[in-house]
């Protein structure tokens, strides 16, 4: 089978082919690659609307998505074993994150009630190792087998910036951070017994590799430290305008330039590489960018390009409630990016491998997923030409080599009538396969609409994808 996009002179389209009669040649991905992250003080518990939103993805994949409990406040939070409260803090404005807080055992009990895997972020910045060890032991006891990893410190490259964290009072650098990570990973890992089952998530920086990256950390780790490390993580917030985020070439370049070499270094160690915290724009997002349909398509494309690059899981950060423009739910009841994440989840669900069919340098993208036997499972076609209003252009994608005897293939369209700037909170809800997700509940609404795409006797079909749209094609 081949997937080719018709456009005269567009060299980026000419290599978008794969053999529909062979095995999948893409990267093996995590069964639940898309996860959610929440700043520690504001994590929601089971039974909330957030769990309904996550349950929609569980229904696609068969497993609860991974979550990370961490963020800026993890290096401001100390464990209080005597506290009966989930968390204790005060702020002058509910849109602020607290500068200090404590949390008790009930907070970790709550984390253990989630049905999927959990990454727990603990404090390193305050330099109170014994307190962090106590919290880690409680996390192991409460979360149990679902505790995927513990990370010690959030974005530690910023420890020497005002207000300077106690651990960095005498200076800070990649070398000093590496020495600190190694010391703490050994101490915490041995205290909780993870020398028999590695639990540490190393790295967790936001500044760019290689200065702050896994490759430079790995060369400073000995075998004992490496034995404690389960995963290596980095953060990423591309930022920019809606038009910039929507660009497929821009998204591909961002992932490739920042992470390709760092991912390769980690994979050589036989460990997973994680985007432990990411979203469109840092600091909670931008009101005129992060809730839009353009950001939804970026979310979809970004996930798939990351998985193609070898990144196992992508945790989309949900920050302070009331000041979270990029939240998939909560800030705007339903943010448009949830639709993009849902489309990416549907594309990857139950797949064994996936690959990109384009070189990432043009406006048009094609991805293929394969089942466990290597047979083609789905195609995702994306037209990143910018559309906001007026006449909407379209791009035909030609599919060749489809199985003989198929009269048609089914497809779901991800679209918004108002284009890149559409926002559900302004009455411009996107649709995925004709379906919307209800404000405040995430309950799917509307029929599940499949388009029928005719297949010729020669095994060829043409799918028209409008500007600022994507189409998911089902091959089985």
Model-flagged regions — what are they?
Residues 33-36, 72-76, 123-128, 153-159, ...:
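Solvent-exposed loop/turn segments at secondary-structure junctions
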Residues 359-405, 411-420, 468-471:
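Carbohydrate-binding surface patches
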Residues 12-198, 202, 210-217:
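N-terminal catalytic cores of secreted or lumenal carbohydrate-active enzymes
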Residues 120, 129, 135-136, 170-299, ...:
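Noncatalytic carbohydrate-binding groove/subsite architecture in carbohydrate-active enzymes
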Residues 67, 120, 150, 155, ...:
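Conserved, mostly hydrophobic/aromatic
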Residues 275, 279-375:
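Aromatic/acidic polysaccharide-binding cleft in carbohydrate-active enzymes
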Residues 463-475:
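Short Pro-Gly-centered flexible turn/kink motifs
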Residues 394, 402-466:
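Acidic, Ser/Thr/Pro-rich beta/coil linker or hinge segments at domain junctions
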């Amino acid at each position: 089978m081949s997937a080719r996009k018709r456009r005269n002179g567009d060299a980026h389209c000419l290599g978008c082919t794969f053999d529909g009669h062979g095995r999948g040649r893409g990267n093996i991905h995590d069964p639940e690659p898309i996860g959610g992250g929440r700043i520690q003080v504001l994590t929601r518990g089971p039974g909330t609307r957030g769990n309904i939103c996550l349950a929609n993805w569980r229904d696609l994949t068969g497993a609860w998505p991974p979550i990370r409990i961490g963020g800026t406040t993890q290096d401001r939070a100390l464990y209080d074993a005597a506290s009966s409260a989930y968390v204790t803090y005060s702020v002058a404005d509910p849109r602020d994150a607290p500068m200090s807080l404590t949390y008790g055992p009930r907070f970790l009990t709550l984390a253990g009630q989630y049905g999927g895997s959990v990454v727990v972020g603990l404090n390193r910045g305050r330099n109170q190792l014994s307190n962090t060890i106590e919290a880690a032991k409680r996390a192991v006891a409460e979360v149990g087998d679902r505790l995927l990893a513990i990370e010690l410190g959030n974005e530690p490259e910023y420890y020497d910036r005002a207000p300077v964290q106690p651990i960095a009072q005498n200076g800070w650098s990649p070398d000093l951070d590496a020495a600190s990570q190694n010391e703490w990973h050994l101490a915490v890992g041995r205290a909780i017994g993870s020398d028999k089952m590695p639990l540490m998530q190393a790295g967790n920086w936001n500044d760019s590799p290689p200065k702050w990256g896994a490759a430079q950390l790995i060369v400073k780790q000995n075998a004992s430290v490496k034995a404690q490390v389960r995963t290596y993580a980095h953060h990423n917030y591309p930022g920019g305008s809606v038009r910039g985020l929507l660009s497929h070439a821009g998204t591909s370049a961002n992932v490739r330039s920042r992470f390709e070499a760092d991912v390769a270094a980690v994979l050589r160690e036989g460990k997973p590489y994680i985007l432990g915290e990411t979203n469109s724009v840092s600091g909670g997002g931008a009101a005129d960018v992060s809730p839009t349909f353009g950001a939804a398509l970026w979310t979809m494309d970004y996930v798939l390009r990351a998985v193609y690059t070898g990144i196992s899981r992508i945790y989309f950060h949900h920050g302070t409630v009331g000041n979270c423009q990029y939240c998939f739910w909560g800030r705007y009841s339903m943010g448009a990016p949830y639709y993009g994440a849902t489309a990416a989840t549907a594309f990857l669900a139950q797949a064994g491998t996936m690959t990109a069919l384009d070189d990432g340098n043009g406006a048009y993208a094609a991805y293929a997923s394969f089942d466990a036997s290597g047979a083609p499972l789905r195609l995702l076609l994306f037209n990143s030409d910018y559309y906001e209003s007026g006449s909407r252009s379209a791009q035909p994608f030609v599919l060749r080599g489809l199985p003989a005897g198929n009269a048609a293939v089914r497809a779901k369209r991800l679209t918004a009538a108002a284009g890149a700037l559409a926002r559900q909170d302004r009455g411009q809800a996107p649709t995925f396969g004709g379906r919307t997700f209800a404000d405040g509940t995430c309950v799917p609404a509307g029929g599940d609409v499949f388009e029928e795409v005719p297949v010729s006797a020669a095994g060829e079909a043409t799918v028209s994808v409008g500007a600022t749209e994507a189409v998911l094609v089902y091959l089985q």
